[in-house]
From Swiss-Prot:
CDD domains xrefs: SAICAR_synt_Ade5
Catalytic activity: 5-amino-1-(5-phospho-D-ribosyl)imidazole-4-carboxylate + L-aspartate + ATP = (2S)-2-[5-amino-1-(5-phospho-beta-D-ribosyl)imidazole-4-carboxamido]succinate + ADP + phosphate + 2 H(+)
Name of the protein in its database record: Phosphoribosylaminoimidazole-succinocarboxamide synthase
GO BP terms in the entry: 'de novo' IMP biosynthetic process
Origin organism lineage: Bacteria, Bacillati, Chloroflexota, Chloroflexia, Chloroflexales
MF annotations from Gene Ontology: ATP binding; phosphoribosylaminoimidazolesuccinocarboxamide synthase activity
SUPFAM superfamilies reported for this sequence: SAICAR synthase-like (SSF56104)
Gene encoding the protein: purC
Keyword vocabulary terms for this entry: ATP-binding, Ligase, Nucleotide-binding, Purine biosynthesis
Pathway(s) served: Purine metabolism; IMP biosynthesis via de novo pathway; 5-amino-1-(5-phospho-D-ribosyl)imidazole-4-carboxamide from 5-amino-1-(5-phospho-D-ribosyl)imidazole-4-carboxylate: step 1/2
Family affiliation: Belongs to the SAICAR synthetase family.
Domain of life: Bacteria
Amino acid sequence: MELGHVLSEGKTKIVYAHPTDPDLAILFHKDGITAGDGARRHVIAGKGALAGQTTANVFRFLNRAGIATHFIEAPEPKLTVVRRCVMIPLEVVMRRLPAGSYLRRYPEAAGQRFDPPLVEFFLKDDARHDPQITPDEIVAQGIATPAEVEQMTMTGQQVFTTLEAAWAKLDVTLVDLKIEFGRAGDGSLLVADVIDNDSWRIWPGGDPNRMLDKQVYRNAQVVDEDVLADVYARYAQVAELTGRWDAVTK
């Protein structure tokens, strides 16, 4: 597919203008994988295609569930055509179980279950390690309106429970999930960016020792070719499993 000029580039993707439609953009999924705000980084051949396939599977599923997203189509595994948005510089994190940074902040929360899913906001700022930010601070800093904060909270929980139910059909526990939002040209708020295997914690059978997500890369003391091959295999399995959601949820 023909690509327009580069609009932006991040650690794991490049955003291109659409060659003929100014209301669309094209995401190119790179083969890079990073952790620690980019302090650890490697290239895994084929990872971008798996990320693109997973993102397409997830967004198609959300669209069919009636959730407004920027996803249009995935003409190639590494390319995603989306509605062009102005991104809100926030990570919106939903948690069913305490894990990761939440447990480091609140170790006493171990063993809890959040119902409804807990929603947290983090400012996208690598230099400051994506600090947590409150809804009041989001509004005070002009990042989003009170109505948008409420919509991101409600939609975030809806996205989580929708994907949680799909994963449950495959006996996989969705522990937590990170998403982003953007404003489309008409001002509407859309679930945007990507949702791939870097975006969540997923535990088959509820067992963290069987994790399929990026945490296995974060946890590795030393990253060698065997670790990267293991990461690739897990990402390939997730791309395949998310492709089965439609069949198992009918």
